[in-house]
């Protein structure tokens, strides 16, 4: 099942040189795991709540692939280039399959409550 790496980042007004190096190197860390950047820093349109910062969404063929990428020596080597300069949150999450049914999920959650 397709999985995603989703990051909510809060970059400073001036990006340090380390961030540019990170950006130059990240795709090479994604390629071996089938990672594809779907959203990267585009302007978000906030409809509910607040959203300071930038959104990054990376697609992977599976949660196993996403975990392997994040834990890979190649990514660990560049992670600090971003993380030391841009605070944020990152999660890895499974996507929904083509047969996802929100109503059935709601019924199951109600029954379990």
Q: Where is each model-derived feature located?
A:
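Short S/T/G/P-rich N-terminal loop/turn motif that feeds into the first structured element of a domain
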Residues: 1-54, 61-68, 94-113
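A contiguous, mid-protein "functional segment" used to position or interact
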Residues: 67-98
């Amino acid at each position: 099942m397709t999985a995603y790496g989703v990051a909510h980042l809060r970059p400073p007004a001036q990006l340090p040189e380390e961030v540019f190096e990170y950006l130059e190197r990240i795709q090479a860390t994604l390629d071996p795991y089938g990672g594809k950047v779907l959203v990267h820093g585009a302007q978000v349109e906030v409809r509910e709540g607040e959203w300071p910062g930038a959104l990054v969404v990376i697609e992977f063929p599976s949660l196993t692939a996403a975990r392997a990428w994040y834990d890979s020596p190649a990514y660990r080597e560049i992670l600090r280039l971003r993380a030391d300069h841009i605070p944020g949150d990152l999660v890895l999450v499974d996507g929904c399959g083509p047969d996802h049914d929100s109503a059935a999920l709601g019924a199951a959650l109600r029954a379990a409550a």
